[in-house]
Curated annotation (Swiss-Prot):
Pathway: Amino-acid biosynthesis; L-histidine biosynthesis; L-histidine from 5-phospho-alpha-D-ribose 1-diphosphate: step 1/9. GO terms for molecular function: histidine-tRNA ligase activity. Its main location: cytoplasm. It comes from Brucella canis (strain ATCC 23365 / NCTC 10854 / RM-666). This is ATP phosphoribosyltransferase regulatory subunit. GO terms for biological process: histidyl-tRNA aminoacylation; L-histidine biosynthetic process. GO terms for cellular component: cytoplasm. Gene3D superfamilies: Bira Bifunctional Protein, Domain 2 (3.30.930.10). Keywords: Amino-acid biosynthesis, Cytoplasm, Histidine biosynthesis. Pfam families: tRNA-synt_His.
Protein backbone atom coordinates (compact mmCIF):
# COMPACT_ATOMS: atom_id res chain seq x y z
CA UNK A 1 0.00 0.00 0.00
CA UNK A 2 1.28 3.45 -0.95
CA UNK A 3 1.20 5.68 2.09
CA UNK A 4 1.69 3.89 5.39
CA UNK A 5 -0.02 4.40 8.75
CA UNK A 6 3.50 4.73 10.20
CA UNK A 7 4.58 7.48 7.80
CA UNK A 8 5.23 11.04 8.99
CA UNK A 9 2.49 12.28 6.63
CA UNK A 10 -0.12 10.04 8.27
CA UNK A 11 0.79 11.32 11.71
CA UNK A 12 1.03 14.94 10.54
CA UNK A 13 -2.46 14.76 9.04
CA UNK A 14 -3.81 13.24 12.24
CA UNK A 15 -2.49 16.30 14.08
CA UNK A 16 -4.10 18.61 11.48
CA UNK A 17 -7.46 16.86 11.79
CA UNK A 18 -7.37 16.89 15.58
CA UNK A 19 -6.83 20.66 15.47
CA UNK A 20 -10.05 21.25 13.50
CA UNK A 21 -12.77 20.52 16.06
CA UNK A 22 -13.76 17.25 14.41
CA UNK A 23 -14.31 13.90 16.10
CA UNK A 24 -12.00 11.24 14.64
CA UNK A 25 -14.15 8.17 13.87
CA UNK A 26 -13.29 4.58 13.00
CA UNK A 27 -15.36 3.14 10.15
CA UNK A 28 -15.51 -0.64 9.44
CA UNK A 29 -13.66 -1.83 6.33
CA UNK A 30 -16.55 -4.07 5.25
CA UNK A 31 -19.63 -2.09 4.24
CA UNK A 32 -23.07 -2.88 2.79
CA UNK A 33 -22.69 -2.34 -0.95
CA UNK A 34 -26.15 -0.99 -1.83
CA UNK A 35 -25.66 2.60 -0.58
CA UNK A 36 -22.54 2.96 -2.75
CA UNK A 37 -24.15 1.29 -5.77
CA UNK A 38 -27.22 3.53 -5.45
CA UNK A 39 -25.60 6.87 -4.64
CA UNK A 40 -21.89 7.00 -5.40
CA UNK A 41 -21.92 7.46 -9.16
CA UNK A 42 -21.04 5.34 -12.18
CA UNK A 43 -17.28 5.91 -11.98
CA UNK A 44 -17.00 4.67 -8.39
CA UNK A 45 -19.48 1.82 -8.95
CA UNK A 46 -17.14 0.30 -11.53
CA UNK A 47 -14.24 0.34 -9.07
CA UNK A 48 -15.87 -1.25 -6.01
CA UNK A 49 -14.65 -4.61 -4.69
CA UNK A 50 -17.89 -6.56 -4.21
CA UNK A 51 -18.61 -9.73 -2.27
CA UNK A 52 -21.54 -11.41 -0.51
CA UNK A 53 -22.13 -12.78 2.97
CA UNK A 54 -23.63 -16.21 3.62
CA UNK A 55 -27.14 -14.71 3.47
CA UNK A 56 -26.54 -13.34 -0.02
CA UNK A 57 -26.32 -9.70 1.09
CA UNK A 58 -24.05 -7.57 -1.11
CA UNK A 59 -21.00 -6.26 0.72
CA UNK A 60 -17.94 -4.32 -0.36
CA UNK A 61 -14.57 -3.13 0.81
CA UNK A 62 -14.90 0.51 1.87
CA UNK A 63 -14.45 2.56 -1.37
CA UNK A 64 -14.82 5.99 0.27
CA UNK A 65 -15.71 7.52 3.63
CA UNK A 66 -18.52 10.04 3.14
CA UNK A 67 -21.39 7.55 2.85
CA UNK A 68 -20.35 5.35 5.82
CA UNK A 69 -19.60 8.39 8.02
CA UNK A 70 -23.11 9.69 7.28
CA UNK A 71 -24.65 6.26 7.93
CA UNK A 72 -22.78 6.08 11.22
CA UNK A 73 -24.13 9.52 12.21
CA UNK A 74 -27.69 8.39 11.48
CA UNK A 75 -27.25 5.10 13.37
CA UNK A 76 -26.00 6.96 16.44
CA UNK A 77 -28.90 9.45 16.20
CA UNK A 78 -26.27 12.10 16.93
CA UNK A 79 -27.14 15.76 17.36
CA UNK A 80 -26.09 18.35 14.80
CA UNK A 81 -24.11 20.34 13.96
CA UNK A 82 -21.39 17.71 14.11
CA UNK A 83 -17.96 17.44 12.51
CA UNK A 84 -16.31 14.08 11.86
CA UNK A 85 -12.73 13.38 10.78
CA UNK A 86 -11.40 10.14 9.33
CA UNK A 87 -8.05 8.69 8.36
CA UNK A 88 -7.75 5.22 6.88
CA UNK A 89 -7.71 2.85 3.94
CA UNK A 90 -10.06 2.83 0.98
CA UNK A 91 -10.20 0.18 -1.74
CA UNK A 92 -10.82 0.82 -5.43
CA UNK A 93 -9.99 -1.07 -8.59
CA UNK A 94 -7.56 1.11 -10.56
CA UNK A 95 -5.71 0.58 -13.85
CA UNK A 96 -2.58 2.15 -12.40
CA UNK A 97 -1.44 2.32 -8.81
CA UNK A 98 -2.37 0.36 -5.72
CA UNK A 99 -5.95 -0.78 -5.16
CA UNK A 100 -5.59 0.03 -1.45
CA UNK A 101 -4.63 3.55 -0.42
CA UNK A 102 -5.10 6.00 2.42
CA UNK A 103 -7.53 8.90 2.60
CA UNK A 104 -8.13 11.56 5.22
CA UNK A 105 -10.92 14.09 5.47
CA UNK A 106 -13.64 15.91 7.37
CA UNK A 107 -17.43 15.70 7.03
CA UNK A 108 -19.32 18.72 8.42
CA UNK A 109 -22.97 17.82 9.09
CA UNK A 110 -25.89 20.05 10.02
CA UNK A 111 -24.18 23.46 9.92
CA UNK A 112 -26.81 26.19 9.56
CA UNK A 113 -24.64 28.67 7.65
CA UNK A 114 -24.14 27.09 4.22
CA UNK A 115 -21.73 29.71 2.90
CA UNK A 116 -19.53 29.65 6.01
CA UNK A 117 -19.38 25.84 6.16
CA UNK A 118 -18.55 25.63 2.43
CA UNK A 119 -15.72 28.10 2.95
CA UNK A 120 -14.51 26.27 6.05
CA UNK A 121 -14.41 22.97 4.15
CA UNK A 122 -12.23 24.47 1.41
CA UNK A 123 -10.03 26.25 3.95
CA UNK A 124 -9.57 23.06 6.02
CA UNK A 125 -8.67 21.01 2.95
CA UNK A 126 -6.22 23.63 1.74
CA UNK A 127 -4.60 23.96 5.18
CA UNK A 128 -4.13 20.19 5.44
CA UNK A 129 -2.50 20.01 2.01
CA UNK A 130 -0.24 22.99 2.71
CA UNK A 131 0.79 21.55 6.08
CA UNK A 132 2.34 18.59 4.24
CA UNK A 133 3.53 20.33 1.06
CA UNK A 134 3.93 24.02 1.96
CA UNK A 135 5.88 25.01 -1.15
CA UNK A 136 4.03 22.95 -3.75
CA UNK A 137 2.41 24.74 -6.70
CA UNK A 138 -1.34 24.26 -6.26
CA UNK A 139 -4.38 24.82 -8.47
CA UNK A 140 -7.85 25.16 -6.93
CA UNK A 141 -10.84 24.52 -9.19
CA UNK A 142 -14.38 25.20 -7.99
CA UNK A 143 -17.73 24.36 -9.55
CA UNK A 144 -21.35 24.60 -8.42
CA UNK A 145 -23.94 22.02 -9.36
CA UNK A 146 -26.76 24.22 -8.04
CA UNK A 147 -25.86 26.99 -10.52
CA UNK A 148 -25.92 24.43 -13.33
CA UNK A 149 -29.31 23.17 -12.09
CA UNK A 150 -30.57 26.77 -12.03
CA UNK A 151 -29.39 27.21 -15.61
CA UNK A 152 -31.32 24.12 -16.74
CA UNK A 153 -34.46 25.38 -15.01
CA UNK A 154 -34.07 28.87 -16.50
CA UNK A 155 -33.84 27.33 -19.98
CA UNK A 156 -37.15 25.56 -19.42
CA UNK A 157 -35.86 22.02 -19.80
CA UNK A 158 -38.30 19.25 -18.77
CA UNK A 159 -37.63 17.62 -15.40
CA UNK A 160 -36.48 14.35 -16.95
CA UNK A 161 -33.82 16.07 -19.01
CA UNK A 162 -32.70 18.15 -16.06
CA UNK A 163 -32.08 14.95 -14.07
CA UNK A 164 -30.18 13.36 -16.95
CA UNK A 165 -27.96 16.39 -17.52
CA UNK A 166 -27.32 16.77 -13.78
CA UNK A 167 -26.11 13.15 -13.71
CA UNK A 168 -23.70 14.05 -16.53
CA UNK A 169 -22.44 17.23 -14.85
CA UNK A 170 -18.65 17.19 -14.58
CA UNK A 171 -18.18 14.38 -17.12
CA UNK A 172 -17.42 16.03 -20.46
CA UNK A 173 -17.91 12.86 -22.52
CA UNK A 174 -21.22 11.99 -20.86
CA UNK A 175 -22.40 15.59 -21.23
CA UNK A 176 -21.54 15.64 -24.95
CA UNK A 177 -23.52 12.43 -25.46
CA UNK A 178 -26.49 13.79 -23.52
CA UNK A 179 -26.53 17.05 -25.49
CA UNK A 180 -26.25 15.14 -28.76
CA UNK A 181 -29.19 13.01 -27.66
CA UNK A 182 -31.19 16.12 -26.77
CA UNK A 183 -30.64 17.56 -30.25
CA UNK A 184 -31.54 14.24 -31.87
CA UNK A 185 -28.09 13.81 -33.45
CA UNK A 186 -27.06 10.80 -31.35
CA UNK A 187 -28.01 7.44 -32.82
CA UNK A 188 -29.20 4.84 -30.32
CA UNK A 189 -28.70 1.11 -30.73
CA UNK A 190 -32.09 -0.62 -31.01
CA UNK A 191 -33.20 -2.89 -28.17
CA UNK A 192 -34.21 -6.52 -28.73
CA UNK A 193 -37.91 -6.61 -29.64
CA UNK A 194 -38.94 -8.40 -26.43
CA UNK A 195 -37.38 -5.63 -24.34
CA UNK A 196 -38.47 -2.82 -26.67
CA UNK A 197 -42.17 -3.72 -26.23
CA UNK A 198 -41.92 -3.52 -22.42
CA UNK A 199 -39.98 -0.24 -22.62
CA UNK A 200 -42.57 1.29 -24.96
CA UNK A 201 -45.36 0.25 -22.56
CA UNK A 202 -43.49 1.66 -19.56
CA UNK A 203 -43.75 -1.73 -17.83
CA UNK A 204 -40.95 -1.32 -15.29
CA UNK A 205 -41.83 -4.44 -13.27
CA UNK A 206 -42.10 -6.72 -16.30
CA UNK A 207 -38.93 -5.30 -17.81
CA UNK A 208 -36.99 -5.75 -14.57
CA UNK A 209 -38.11 -9.39 -14.36
CA UNK A 210 -36.99 -10.08 -17.92
CA UNK A 211 -33.64 -8.38 -17.35
CA UNK A 212 -33.08 -10.37 -14.14
CA UNK A 213 -33.84 -13.63 -15.95
CA UNK A 214 -31.41 -12.76 -18.75
CA UNK A 215 -28.71 -11.80 -16.24
CA UNK A 216 -29.10 -15.09 -14.36
CA UNK A 217 -29.05 -17.04 -17.63
CA UNK A 218 -25.79 -15.28 -18.54
CA UNK A 219 -24.30 -16.08 -15.13
CA UNK A 220 -24.36 -12.45 -13.97
CA UNK A 221 -25.42 -11.74 -10.39
CA UNK A 222 -28.33 -9.23 -10.34
CA UNK A 223 -26.67 -7.67 -7.29
CA UNK A 224 -23.43 -6.89 -9.12
CA UNK A 225 -23.50 -3.30 -10.36
CA UNK A 226 -26.85 -1.82 -11.35
CA UNK A 227 -29.91 -3.81 -10.30
CA UNK A 228 -32.48 -4.99 -12.88
CA UNK A 229 -34.97 -2.46 -11.48
CA UNK A 230 -32.50 0.39 -11.92
CA UNK A 231 -31.64 -0.71 -15.47
CA UNK A 232 -35.34 -0.99 -16.34
CA UNK A 233 -36.04 2.47 -14.95
CA UNK A 234 -33.16 3.95 -16.96
CA UNK A 235 -34.27 2.28 -20.20
CA UNK A 236 -37.83 3.60 -19.83
CA UNK A 237 -36.51 7.04 -18.91
CA UNK A 238 -34.29 7.05 -22.03
CA UNK A 239 -37.30 6.22 -24.20
CA UNK A 240 -39.27 9.12 -22.70
CA UNK A 241 -36.35 11.50 -23.10
CA UNK A 242 -35.78 10.49 -26.72
CA UNK A 243 -39.18 11.94 -27.58
CA UNK A 244 -38.08 15.39 -26.38
CA UNK A 245 -35.98 17.74 -28.50
CA UNK A 246 -34.92 21.25 -27.57
CA UNK A 247 -34.35 24.44 -29.60
CA UNK A 248 -30.83 24.80 -30.93
CA UNK A 249 -30.57 28.36 -29.57
CA UNK A 250 -31.22 27.17 -26.01
CA UNK A 251 -28.64 24.41 -26.32
CA UNK A 252 -26.14 26.92 -27.65
CA UNK A 253 -26.72 29.02 -24.51
CA UNK A 254 -26.12 25.95 -22.36
CA UNK A 255 -22.83 25.27 -24.14
CA UNK A 256 -21.81 28.92 -23.69
CA UNK A 257 -22.54 28.64 -19.98
CA UNK A 258 -20.48 25.44 -19.63
CA UNK A 259 -17.54 27.19 -21.33
CA UNK A 260 -17.29 29.86 -18.58
CA UNK A 261 -13.95 29.54 -16.77
CA UNK A 262 -12.77 32.57 -14.79
CA UNK A 263 -11.12 33.40 -11.48
CA UNK A 264 -13.52 33.33 -8.53
CA UNK A 265 -13.11 37.06 -7.87
CA UNK A 266 -14.77 37.82 -11.24
CA UNK A 267 -17.11 34.81 -11.42
CA UNK A 268 -20.24 36.38 -9.91
CA UNK A 269 -20.03 39.42 -12.18
CA UNK A 270 -19.48 37.16 -15.20
CA UNK A 271 -22.47 34.97 -14.33
CA UNK A 272 -24.78 37.94 -13.65
CA UNK A 273 -23.81 39.50 -16.98
CA UNK A 274 -24.43 36.21 -18.78
CA UNK A 275 -27.86 35.88 -17.14
CA UNK A 276 -28.82 39.48 -17.92
CA UNK A 277 -27.65 39.31 -21.55
CA UNK A 278 -29.73 36.19 -22.15
CA UNK A 279 -32.80 36.99 -19.99
CA UNK A 280 -32.16 34.06 -17.64
CA UNK A 281 -33.49 34.03 -14.07
CA UNK A 282 -30.50 32.90 -11.99
CA UNK A 283 -31.02 35.35 -9.14
CA UNK A 284 -31.55 32.91 -6.25
CA UNK A 285 -28.63 30.59 -7.06
CA UNK A 286 -26.30 33.52 -7.73
CA UNK A 287 -27.11 35.07 -4.33
CA UNK A 288 -25.89 31.85 -2.70
CA UNK A 289 -22.87 31.79 -5.00
CA UNK A 290 -21.91 35.33 -4.00
CA UNK A 291 -22.42 34.62 -0.28
CA UNK A 292 -20.06 31.65 -0.53
CA UNK A 293 -17.46 33.67 -2.43
CA UNK A 294 -17.58 36.33 0.29
CA UNK A 295 -17.16 33.64 2.97
CA UNK A 296 -14.17 32.18 1.13
CA UNK A 297 -12.55 35.62 1.04
CA UNK A 298 -13.27 36.07 4.76
CA UNK A 299 -11.58 32.71 5.41
CA UNK A 300 -8.37 34.24 4.09
CA UNK A 301 -8.22 32.45 0.74
CA UNK A 302 -7.28 34.57 -2.27
CA UNK A 303 -10.22 34.38 -4.69
CA UNK A 304 -8.00 35.28 -7.63
CA UNK A 305 -6.13 32.02 -6.99
CA UNK A 306 -9.32 29.94 -7.39
CA UNK A 307 -10.66 28.99 -10.83
CA UNK A 308 -14.43 28.88 -11.23
CA UNK A 309 -15.28 26.41 -13.99
CA UNK A 310 -19.00 26.28 -14.83
CA UNK A 311 -18.62 22.74 -16.25
CA UNK A 312 -16.66 21.33 -13.31
CA UNK A 313 -18.22 18.58 -11.25
CA UNK A 314 -16.99 15.53 -9.37
CA UNK A 315 -17.81 11.90 -10.26
CA UNK A 316 -20.08 11.21 -7.28
CA UNK A 317 -23.86 11.38 -7.63
CA UNK A 318 -24.60 12.76 -4.18
CA UNK A 319 -23.22 16.29 -4.65
CA UNK A 320 -25.82 19.10 -4.79
CA UNK A 321 -23.93 22.42 -4.71
CA UNK A 322 -20.31 23.38 -4.20
CA UNK A 323 -17.68 21.03 -5.64
CA UNK A 324 -13.95 21.64 -5.60
CA UNK A 325 -10.54 20.07 -6.13
CA UNK A 326 -7.07 21.04 -4.98
CA UNK A 327 -4.56 19.88 -7.56
CA UNK A 328 -0.83 19.62 -8.05
CA UNK A 329 -0.35 22.32 -10.69
CA UNK A 330 2.71 20.49 -12.06
CA UNK A 331 0.80 17.23 -12.70
CA UNK A 332 -2.13 17.65 -15.07
CA UNK A 333 -2.75 13.93 -15.52
CA UNK A 334 -3.21 12.62 -11.98
CA UNK A 335 -2.70 15.62 -9.75
CA UNK A 336 -5.87 15.74 -7.60
CA UNK A 337 -4.67 15.99 -4.00
CA UNK A 338 -7.99 16.78 -2.32
CA UNK A 339 -11.59 17.04 -3.42
CA UNK A 340 -14.87 17.83 -1.78
CA UNK A 341 -18.29 19.37 -1.99
CA UNK A 342 -21.80 19.81 -0.61
CA UNK A 343 -24.32 16.95 -0.35
CA UNK A 344 -27.52 18.28 1.21
CA UNK A 345 -29.76 15.34 0.21
CA UNK A 346 -27.44 12.45 1.02
CA UNK A 347 -28.40 11.87 4.65
CA UNK A 348 -32.11 11.86 3.82
CA UNK A 349 -31.45 9.31 1.07
CA UNK A 350 -29.57 7.21 3.62
CA UNK A 351 -32.54 7.20 6.00
CA UNK A 352 -32.24 10.31 8.20
CA UNK A 353 -35.62 11.37 9.60
CA UNK A 354 -35.00 15.03 8.81
CA UNK A 355 -32.97 16.96 6.27
CA UNK A 356 -29.34 17.33 7.39
CA UNK A 357 -27.07 19.42 5.15
CA UNK A 358 -23.50 18.27 4.70
CA UNK A 359 -20.20 19.30 3.17
CA UNK A 360 -16.85 17.54 3.27
CA UNK A 361 -13.56 16.68 1.62
CA UNK A 362 -11.10 13.83 1.13
CA UNK A 363 -7.31 13.93 0.75
CA UNK A 364 -5.29 11.33 -1.19
CA UNK A 365 -2.29 10.56 1.00
CA UNK A 366 -0.33 8.70 -1.69
CA UNK A 367 -0.44 11.67 -4.06
CA UNK A 368 0.33 14.13 -1.29
CA UNK A 369 3.25 11.97 -0.21
CA UNK A 370 4.64 11.91 -3.76
CA UNK A 371 4.28 15.68 -4.03
CA UNK A 372 5.98 16.29 -0.69
CA UNK A 373 8.87 14.08 -1.76
CA UNK A 374 8.76 11.92 1.34
CA UNK A 375 11.40 9.18 1.31
CA UNK A 376 10.29 5.65 2.01
Amino acid sequence: MVGSRTSPIFNALRVELNAREAELVEIPLIQPADPFLDMAGEDLRRRIFLTENENGDSLCLRPEFTIPVCRNHIALNAATPKRYAYLGEVFRQRRDGAAEFLQAGIEDLGAADEAASDARSLADALSCVKAIAPDAPLEIVLGDQSVFAGMLKALGLPQGWRKKLLRSFGDAHSMDLALAELTGTQRRDPLPESLAVLVAEGDEIGLARMLEAEMLEAGISPGAGRTPVEIARRLIEKEDLAATHFPAAALDLLRQFLAIRVSLDTAAVTLRAFAADNALDLGAVLQKFEARADAIAQAGIEMKDIIYDASFGRPLDYYTGLVYEIRDASNRQDGVLAGGGRYDRLLTMLGACEAIPGVGFSIWLDRLQALAGEKQ
